[in-house]
Amino acid sequence: MAAPNSLISLLGRTPDPEQLRHVHTIPARKAVNEPWPHWVHPDIVDAYGTLGIQEPYRHQIQAADLAHSGQHVVIATGTASGKSLAYQLPALDAIHRSELRVLSDPGKIHDDGAVTLYLSPTKALAADQLAAIRALKLPTVRAETYDGDTDVASRRWIRDHANFILANPDMLHFGILPNHTWWARFFRRLRYVIVDEAHSYRGVFGSHVANLMRRLRRICAYYGAGNSFPEPIFIAASATASDPGVSFGRLIGAPVREVSEDCSPHGSTTVAFWEPALTDVRGENGAKQRRTAVAETADILANLVSSRVRTIAFIKSRRGAESIASITKRLLDEVDPSLPGRVAAYRSGYLPEERRALEQALRSGQLLGVSSTSALELGIDISGLDAVLVAGWPGTRASLFQQIGRAGRAGQDAIAAFVASDDPLDTYLVNHPEAIFDVSVEATVFDPGNPYVLGPHLCAAAAELPIGPGELDLFGPTSEDLLDRLVDQGYLRKRPAGWFWTHPESAAGMVNLRADGGGPVSIVDAETGSLLGTMDSPQTHYQAHTGAIYVHQGESYLVEDLNEADHCVMVRRVNPDFYTTARDVTQIEVLETSRSVQWGDVTVHFGDVKVTTQVVSFQRKALISNEILGEEPLELGARDLFTKAVWFVVDNRSLHGAGLVEAEFPGALHAAEHAAIGLLPLVASSDRWDIGGVSTALHADTGVPTIFVYDGHPGGAGFAERGFEKAKIWLTATRDAIKACECDNGCPSCVQSPKCGNKNNPLDKAAAITLLGVLLKDAT
């Protein structure tokens, strides 16, 4: 491979491409090794030796030592740093030694055997870990996956005999905890719980998993009372994150030690910051639009593949991954007809054998280019890659580092490029690389106390075992009031010994781990009658309204009918050259203010709000150019959302003092609100679509100009609260992003929003910069 700096010229068609905004070099890192700990059985050391692992890295041993000594621990280091060895070592050693004791005295009943539970967010990652465990060929270790694909006979054998079980949170919630009496032997012996990819548990999903971990701990305590280890040790593997020990401690509800110094070797990585050029395509209000990240990334991928540079392009959506692959193939066919066959899309939804074949083709070099969703971001072992492209901000710095870490995995130098999408956050980051590399990685944000999440988990916990008064601390300070509310609603019955589940139906069914309520709506293929999938009711107005393009496993479907009464959406398979975006109008009411801070004449609040939203129309936009092809009205009912918000209050006098007149207030507030929504993911691990906003020159509850930004989930998800805590950093970045945009009057890269039901009108870019200056004047 050529030197990384020379590869920059391959990204574009000239040695100094105009789209290149900045170049940042991540320096190479040498390995720091440690000897094997004295407590590790020689058989375990020998097993790793057969795989070529002779001496572990320091961070692996630090984490393994902490877990072996009985302390909960999280290891938060980079991609390909060997985190799995850190949790495998104590777990396999405990299993191996306990099995050897059984073999040495087969006539004796042994009650102190050790077992391990491994949890991952995806079945694919669990399958890879299973292969890694089996590769060690330790005859004492009986490792098996336990998920929705496991047949009934195998489940019984796994419960009774497996000592290293790999599962996911969904199976723990639906299959294991509600049936804990079947698992009594397992829970009595459970020594370690491994939580892989812990940074992925954020937002509402993270809130659910946090309560799931508390339920797991109380079941373990029930079966472990009186044992030599009454509660298992939790070990987490995480991407780099801010305060990983604090975050994982909040996830499991217990103090945690952290190991975050990466001592594995890595070649240098040259990171290019790439902003697609403005085009002649005009969007709303005549604003110029940039070339899309999809089209730009496909161009770059074609350039790299034609130079035989092995490359992965990451993008968040399945449709985006498929589009990048198809455009790249078309471009390569014009250059060399042998090359299109060496490019493929990789996404979730493939059959296991298809996924394995793609991974092997990439490892062997048969494939030169892959466009992928985050399926490859997780810890699947793909090595020997030369370049990584990231199409659009992946959501968090942790995800970005996970993705660019795929290049140069075997220690060689590599190149990565961040290709900006046409939105405020990407605009800011591509012009401010220091916001990625010179600050700590963002915290993992979730709220276990969200009553819409905690309530159903309290019901599930009570169904598993009655909740005693001494357990209230485990579920947080709001749990007692919430339990009494559940009694009033008829879900629970209170007795002197605690709270009991009294309903005949499954309490676990009240919880949807990966969504936030509203009940599932079925997505049905109108031609075949087959069920394609389900969607939460709150999402349907945005993603499954009549006329919407719905994407399932890379295939596009046109929504023909949304039947809310029957909870059903009928779709028909199509092959469109456009996508759809819903637009809404919103009203907001302040219910309660929890926290406030004064910035001179500006007040920043955080608290409870009622948001009333109505989807009023949708736009069709060209896949490649983002050109608006048309807009159609929708007649959908308004919906209420009770959630959390942060809001900024400023009086007219302060705005007048900055030179603004009242006619400019609405456009300034509206533009600042849009940009602030786009920039919140900079400080909170949210997606732009997780949050919403409202601005008004005269709000009924404040009586003055106000900007609201709220969590788009019932009860909140922690994003707005993070915005309140980091408000100065957040608004400073918002102002800088608007300033950095080269447009004249506002565009999708700075102050326009694809969701705006007011057709991005009024917007005043210059006045928004002035307004943000007023808000920040006395910020602390």
Locate the predicted segments by residue:
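Auxiliary Fe-S-binding modules of radical SAM enzymes
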Residues: 481, 743, 755-758
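Short cysteine clusters
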Residues: 741, 746-750
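Structured, non-catalytic alpha/beta "coupling" segments that mediate domain-domain communication
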Residues: 2-20, 317, 553-562, 568, ...
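Extended Lys/Arg-rich polyanion-binding regions
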Residues: 414-416, 422-436, 457-468, 484-485, ...
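Acidic, low-complexity intrinsically disordered tails
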Residues: 106-108, 774-780
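Juxtamembrane regulatory segments of integral membrane proteins
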Residues: 749, 758-759
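Helicase motor core with emphasis on the C-terminal RecA-like subdomain
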Residues: 8-51, 55-58, 62, 68-74, ...
